[in-house]
Amino acid sequence: NDEFLYTLLVPERARTLFPCFDQPDMKAVFTLQLDIPEQWVAVANAAVESETLHEGRKLIAFQPTQPLSTYLFSFVAGKWQQLAESRDGKTIVMYYRETDPQKVAQHTIIFDQVFASLKWLEDYTGIPYPFDKYDLVIVPGFQFGGMEHPGAVLYNDKRMFLGPHPTIEEELGRMELIAHETT
């Protein structure tokens, strides 16, 4: 729409975006450049390498990804708000479009749960988080609970920003979703 866009290439839709062998066992390194309106922001699997402004447009070049299956390649662009939190040398950025301050205030719980999931996974496996970054994008009306794109995890807004009196099931569901997408 005129406000934002995102990719969702699971299970074998990458071939609709670019020519590829669209099967999970074959991985590739992706480089991406996006030409977007100047007031938009963009998020992808890898960190931003450079931004260039020209005549109301923004050209964003991203660093090359680590090897990924094609269905895990992702980018998001649009008018997003963002919050960042750093702990133990890791910074996570949350992108969202929610305007209700009570819902946005849940960012503390969301960050707590993401950092806890990452720490548990690293402790359990003995392997540090293998990707350059972990950003999360809370997408209005996202058709699944979430999608584990490395470096740019997408989440459904209703599953992340709960109502004023969430049930235990809703709270546990959010934690389970975060743990699932983190692994």
Language-model regions, residue ranges each:
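Short active-site segment of divalent metal-dependent hydrolases/proteases
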Residues: 183
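Hydrophobic helix-coil surface modules that form long, contiguous segments used
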Residues: 8-12, 19-179
